[in-house]
Amino acid sequence: MSLFDWFADRRKGQYVGNVKQEPEEGDGLWSKCPECGLVVYLKDLRLNASVCAGCGYHHRIDSSERLALIADPESFQPLNEHLAPIDPLGFKDRRAYADRLRESQSATGLNDGVVTGLCRVDGIGMGLAVMDFRFMGGSMGSVVGEKITRLVEECTKRKLPLLIVCASGGARMQEGMLSLMQMAKISGALERHREAELLYLPLLTHPTTGGVTASFAMLGDLILAEPKALIGFAGRRVIEQTLREKLPDNFQTAEYLQDHGFVDTIIPRTQFRSTLASLLRLHGSKSLELTNA
């Protein structure tokens, strides 16, 4: 038997399907900035609050990452975790609303699109709500509205300041009027919080649109935003078609809204925690143990 025949016999006896493909060494280790194209080690990116070191682009982060950046370690006490949405209208478009809910819950590990609770920031007690855009685009349904309302009421009862981190496409259309009424419900709770002379700060992140913008996102004592965040009510294309005019390139950005008086200040994510602590102290908020509040 020649050497060529020996190799041919060896190939016949092999089953290609048994060959195991090794994963790429770099899978999940690197991130490319969509703004400047800089490739960064993912661990280093997260150490910089998911902000690009080259151009300052703010990558989107989930609710757990946001909580870790804002609250003192091990200080966050979640509220109303058990609340979960139902499908009151039996809504179905291309897919059933119930299926969309199950898919989002499985992908995020959350019951709905907001995490609420009490925490400390540099020792100062406060209420904190963080919307998560991964859950159906951060849309506001009845559970999102109820959790935020209960948090506002708890802060009013305990005399605590409040921060809501907004990231939403607006009201959840699959719940119809039940989602729209959350705008008024949250706004009413915030008015009672204001009457108690307590501080409310919304942080507008990318994107903050629709019914969220039209309600609690714009009701703060100071309206804060992240750099280059998309902030608006209707979409750019809808406005252009309605007005029949071309809009500026930076229209509906945080910088544009600040220039026109709708946003008070823009705070880079890497500086937000220290700035928030300063604002709380300026308002007269004091260090306290939340369990004794």
From Swiss-Prot:
Binds 1 zinc ion per subunit. Keywords: ATP-binding, Cytoplasm, Fatty acid biosynthesis, Fatty acid metabolism, Lipid biosynthesis, Lipid metabolism, Metal-binding, Nucleotide-binding, Transferase, Zinc, Zinc-finger. InterPro entries: AcCoA_carboxyl_beta, Acetyl_CoA_COase_Trfase_b_su, ClpP/crotonase-like_dom_sf, COA_CT_N, Znf-ACC. PROSITE patterns: COA_CT_NTER (PS50980). It is an enzyme of class 2 (transferase). This is Acetyl-coenzyme A carboxylase carboxyl transferase subunit beta. GO terms for cellular component: acetyl-CoA carboxylase complex. Residues 29-293 form the CoA carboxyltransferase N-terminal domain. Pathway: Lipid metabolism; malonyl-CoA biosynthesis; malonyl-CoA from acetyl-CoA: step 1/1. Zn(2+) binds at C33, C36, C52, C55. Disulfide bonds: none annotated. SUPFAM superfamilies: ClpP/crotonase. It catalyses: N(6)-carboxybiotinyl-L-lysyl-[protein] + acetyl-CoA = N(6)-biotinyl-L-lysyl-[protein] + malonyl-CoA. A zinc finger (C4-type) spans 33-55. Its cofactor is Zn(2+).
